[in-house]
């Protein structure tokens, strides 16, 4: 477990104390990425909910996912190395809530989105992410550098007569080559 993740788990467990919860389930992309120092729980950025979630109890932390996602989360995201125990369920079963309940016991469970009979605590979780850690600041600097480099590479490849959609495609390609997700890219030409 990294010092960054340790600090974040302390924040979450402090929230458990303040809210009288025994566990919290993080399903949103942003919260999953925050709690894992950048791991991706999603297949598509078109949804706010990922293919895996994190359950944090007072003394353990788990990743809950279907059996298809588990190998990727282990090999690519290295979540077990970060201190998360991966618990799976068959891909064809909707067992996320039941598995969370099994792992957390009979106590109160919060969730960052309305889900099952868990208490919705998304509004209380978001402020935990507002102050950046030194590691996050460094990652943002690196992301800024990588984004600038992608924009420069794409801009250098633009030729007179290129369609706006072709320019967007070039930039998208440069971003994706570096594993950078984007929400929107615009291009304008005269």
Task: Label every PLM stretch briefly.
Residues 1-152, 164-165:
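A composition/biophysics-driven feature that prefers long, compositionally simple stretches
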Residues 133-190:
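Internal metal/ion-chelating core segments
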């Amino acid at each position: 477990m990294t010092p960054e993740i340790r600090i974040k788990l302390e924040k979450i467990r402090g929230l458990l104390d303040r809210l009288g919860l025994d566990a919290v389930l993080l399903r949103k992309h942003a919260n999953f990425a925050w709690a894992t120092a950048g791991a991706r729980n999603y297949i598509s950025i078109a949804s706010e909910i990922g293919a895996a979630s994190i359950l944090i109890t007072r003394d353990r932390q788990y990743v809950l996912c279907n059996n298809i996602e588990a190998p990727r989360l282990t090999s690519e995201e290295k979540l077990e190395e970060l201190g998360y125990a991966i618990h799976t369920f068959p891909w064809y079963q909707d067992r996320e809530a039941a598995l969370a309940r099994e792992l957390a016991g009979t106590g109160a469970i919060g969730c960052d989105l309305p889900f099952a009979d868990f208490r919705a605590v998304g509004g209380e979780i978001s402020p935990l992410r507002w102050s950046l850690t030194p590691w996050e600041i460094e990652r943002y600097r690196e992301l800024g550098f990588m984004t600038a480099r992608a924009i420069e590479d794409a801009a250098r490849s633009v030729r007179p007569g290129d369609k706006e959609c072709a320019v967007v495609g070039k930039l998208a390609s440069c971003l994706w080559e570096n594993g950078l997700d984007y929400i929107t890219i615009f291009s304008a030409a005269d």
